[in-house]
Amino acid sequence: DATTNAAASDLSTHSNLVGSQTLSLSGTGTLANKHVGSNKTVTINTLALADGSNGGLAANYTLTGGTHQLTVNQRPLNATLARQYDATTTAAGSTLSSFDALQGGENLTMSGSGTAVSKNVANGIAMASNGNLALVDGTGSASNYSLNSTVINISKRVLNSSGSKTYDGNTNALASAITLSNLASSETLVDSGTATISSANVGSYTISNLTGVSIADGTNGGLASNYTLTGGTHNFIVNRRVIGVSGTRLYDATTNAAASDLSTHSNLVGSQTLSL
């Protein structure tokens, strides 16, 4: 428990009593150090005897000169690891999130890796094998603890996206023009729907509204439930639209094609017009 206390309640075995007599014990003794060990010597400190049963009177006994020992056992810890989905069942000690029962403000780390029973997103996934997962000294000593159980919380992998289109006069960013990135391994997903950018005009934008885009299962084991678009970086580029111009004029003995003669402009968006 990270202290040198030897509580009377822990010193439950009383030896060298007469017959069936018993005594009770109160107070706290002291150990030389806080660490795990067998039959560690207890200094009496405030430990005191009190009358018990079957005729046991404290006045007939003394703790002075006796042998007083306490065994300090390793405290079992339950560890929780946490990481994003990565398409593997690897549970690395380096992804340690928390322990449940560290004492006295102590901390420990973990090394090695185990194998989880599932690779998919969930909380509290058990280990198929602890592998070589091990406790490592922090401000506390690993030797004072034992690893009882380990689980891993696997969260959704955050996707990024990028895309582009030719200027079309609207703020739509179609999923068909968007490429997803940060997928695990060789997995793929299918995206559909329409996102929204902040302006219809040519430029580079961060997609401001992804609520219209959804992801669905893809290939090579890609499950939409293991991924999220929320929190990712989503960029979209609107490129210039190429237009054509045409027209006619009378022969004038020059090679000039005056803007005023090129009166037909094609491939403009909607009812938009330009001057030349």
Predicted regions and their residues:
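Short loop/turn motifs that initiate or flank beta-strands
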Residues: 2-276
